[in-house]
C-alpha cells in the first residue's frame, strides 16, 4: 500500500516536530526546507494536522508550529487513518461487473487491516527515540 504524499509528508513533519525540545516552536518554512517540499502543500498538511490536534499552531510575530500532544501519544495508525483515503479499490457494481462474486475485496480489506495493525504498534516517539542518525539527518542536536 502506497501512502499519498499528503500522509507521507504529514508523518515527516510530525517526526521533525517531535525532535524539537518540548514546547519549542518552529516554522512551516523550516519544515519545508528540511524536506524540500512545496510550502503550499505543507501549509495544507499542517492545517489538517492542527485540526486533528497533532500540531499546535501559534499565530503572530513569535508564532510557529509544534507538536500538539506528547509524541508517545501519537499512534502512527491513527495519523494514517485520519489523513489517508483507505479505500484500496473501487468495488461498486457500477464500476466492476464481477463484484458480486469477487473475493479480492475481502483479501484487500484484510491486508489493509494488517497494515494498520502494524502501524498501531508504533508511536511517533518510537521513531525518534534513541535514533541519533535521524537527528543528524534532520540537523538536530544529538544528546548522549
UniProtKB/Swiss-Prot annotation:
Residues 28-51 bind DNA. GO terms for cellular component: cytosol. Binds 1 [2Fe-2S] cluster per subunit. Keywords: 2Fe-2S, DNA-binding, Iron, Iron-sulfur, Metal-binding, Repressor, Transcription, Transcription regulation. [2Fe-2S] cluster binds at residues 91, 96, 102. Residues 2-129 form the HTH rrf2-type domain. GO terms for molecular function: 2 iron, 2 sulfur cluster binding; DNA-binding transcription factor activity; double-stranded DNA binding; iron ion binding. One of its GO terms (biological process) is negative regulation of DNA-templated transcription. Its cofactor is [2Fe-2S] cluster. Pfam families: Rrf2. NCBIfam families: PRK11014.1, rrf2_super. Nitric oxide-sensitive repressor of genes involved in protecting the cell against nitrosative stress. May require iron for activity. This is HTH-type transcriptional repressor NsrR. It comes from Photobacterium profundum (strain SS9).
Amino acid at each position: 500500500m502506497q501512502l499519498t504524499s499528503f500522509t507521507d509528508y504529514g508523518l515527516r513533519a510530525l517526526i521533525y516536530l517531535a525532535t524539537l525540545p518540548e514546547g519549542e516552536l518552529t516554522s512551516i518554512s523550516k519544515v519545508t526546507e528540511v524536506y524540500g517540499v512545496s510550502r503550499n502543500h505543507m501549509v495544507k498538511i499542517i492545517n489538517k494536522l492542527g485540526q486533528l490536534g497533532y500540531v499546535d499552531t501559534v499565530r503572530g510575530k513569535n508564532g510557529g508550529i509544534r507538536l500538539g500532544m506528547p509524541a508517545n501519544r501519537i499512534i502512527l495508525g491513527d495519523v494514517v487513518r485520519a489523513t489517508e483515503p483507505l479505500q484500496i479499490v473501487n468495488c461498486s457494481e457500477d464500476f466492476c461487473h464481477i463484484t458480486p462474486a469477487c473475493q479480492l475485496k475481502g483479501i484487500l480489506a484484510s491486508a489493509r487491516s494488517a497494515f494498520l495493525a502494524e502501524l498501531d504498534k508504533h508511536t511517533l516517539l518510537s521513531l525518534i527515540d534513541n535514533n541519533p542518525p535521524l537527528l543528524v539527518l534532520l540537523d538536530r542536536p544529538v544528546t548522549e
